[in-house]
Regions:
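A cross-kingdom marker for long, charged
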Residues: 199-259
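Solvent-exposed loop/turn segments at secondary-structure junctions
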Residues: 26-28, 72-75, 118-122, 231-234
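N-terminal post-signal-peptidase region of extra-cytosolic proteins
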Residues: 43-55, 85
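Bacterial Sec-dependent N-terminal signal peptides
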Residues: 1-14
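Acidic/histidine-rich helix-loop elements
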Residues: 26-47
Length: 259
């Protein structure tokens, strides 16, 4: 019997590898990004209770691998996790350890998996462009600062679970990626294009991250990968993964606490 004029295909969704992307702010205030959240003390009793709740709800995803924002070629992260398993390391205040290590131990994982690529530095000084393109850089600064202010305000009122749920909303992903197209991509002329070059380098880093993530499931089926990364990365990774049919992306919000 014909099926709407289309060839019927076998449903392989059950064999697909699954990815959940948890976009975070940096709990430990490393100030390594252009725009940074002023995180409060995640080691306080209140925040520790909230982190435990986030970890418990994330456990329902049942990840087979936990991928973290740490250089993929550096063994220090997993070595630290091994010490943590042996009771020889106290969790620091980064989201990688507070959520990543804690969850991995809860689930009995023998390893955690760093998948980041080295940050690719720009070869131009934004200050040099202040004259002709100052209006774009000014708008970028104002927009970025406004986003950080909103997150900082939410931090005073909401739990970590609620903050993460907001960060991982589609509207936040769109706002994040839009910054690159709206304020950086237009910068430059035919013989000098620092804006497109900056966007290209950001894309390259995130494509390398995706490469490392994909390697975790290479040649396997039914893997369930949880990626814990800065929200600026996960917004772009979701975009890339929409074109990778071998992976099914699940909405992380269903695995975050409701309050």
């Amino acid at each position: 019997m014909p099926v709407s004029g289309q060839l019927a295909s076998k449903d392989t969704s059950a064999q697909k590898n699954t990815i959940a992307l948890l976009g975070t702010y940096h709990f430990n205030n490393p100030n390594q990004d252009q725009f940074n959240v002023n995180s409060d003390d995640v080691l306080s009793a209140k925040r520790q209770k909230e982190i435990a709740q986030v970890t418990a709800t994330l456990a329902a995803y049942k990840p087979s691998h936990i991928a973290l924002e740490f250089n993929a070629n550096d063994t220090a992260m997993d070595a630290r996790y091994q010490r943590y398993l042996k009771g020889q390391h106290t969790l620091n205040n980064s989201e990688l350890e507070q959520i990543g290590f804690r969850l991995a131990k809860m689930l009995g994982h023998p390893h955690v998996y760093p998948v980041d690529a080295p940050s690719i530095q720009l070869d131009f000084n934004p200050g040099e462009l202040a004259g002709e393109y100052g209006y774009l850089l000014e708008q970028l600064g104002k927009t970025g600062d406004s986003i950080m202010t909103q997150i900082n305000d939410r931090m005073k009122k909401y739990t970590i679970g609620q903050i993460l749920a907001n960060l991982n909303a589609p509207a936040m992903d769109k706002l994040n990626v839009e910054l690159y197209y709206k304020y950086l991509l237009p910068i430059g002329k035919s013989d000098n294009q620092p804006g497109p070059e900056a966007v290209t380098r950001w894309y390259k880093r995130n494509l390398l991250v995706l490469h490392h993530i994909m390697k975790l499931a290479e040649g396997k089926n039914n893997q369930r990968i949880l990626v814990i990364f800065g929200q600026g990365h996960t917004a772009m990774l979701k975009q890339f993964l929409s074109y990778v049919s071998d992976f099914r992306v699940v909405n992380i919000q269903q695995f975050l606490p409701a309050n």
